Amino acid sequence: MSRRRYSVFLDLLRQARIDVGMTQADVARKLGVPQSYVSKCESGTRRMDVTEVHAWLDAVDRDRVTFMLTLGHALDAQGLQTFPPSRF
């Protein structure tokens, strides 16, 4: 995933936390990790794998499918195709 695409993903992930009124420390407690882990994930310093994203979305009580659809729409709106045609 390109930096621009990953940045859109991180913005949505961060916004999901903020929308439910949770701090980074709140998410960290739910995940059983240090607050610094949440900070590094949100800043893009630490990339997340799919299982970590699922756990994060569960922690902030977000539906996974809805989140992914929202991500796709956000990428499309910014002209960042989800799957570049040249790759398929």
Identify the residue ranges that each predicted region occupies:
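A short, Lys/Arg-rich alpha-helix, primarily the initiator
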Residues: 1-19
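Residues in the recognition helix of alpha-helical DNA-binding motifs
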Residues: 16, 30, 41, 70
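Residue-level signal for the short linker/turn that defines the boundary of a DNA-recognition helix
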Residues: 11, 21-22, 48-51
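Alpha-helical residues within the helix-turn-helix
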Residues: 18, 29, 58
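Short, charged recognition helix plus adjacent turn
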Residues: 66-88
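Residues within the helices of the helix-turn-helix
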Residues: 14, 25, 54
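DNA major-groove recognition helix of helix-turn-helix/homeodomain DNA-binding modules
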Residues: 51-69
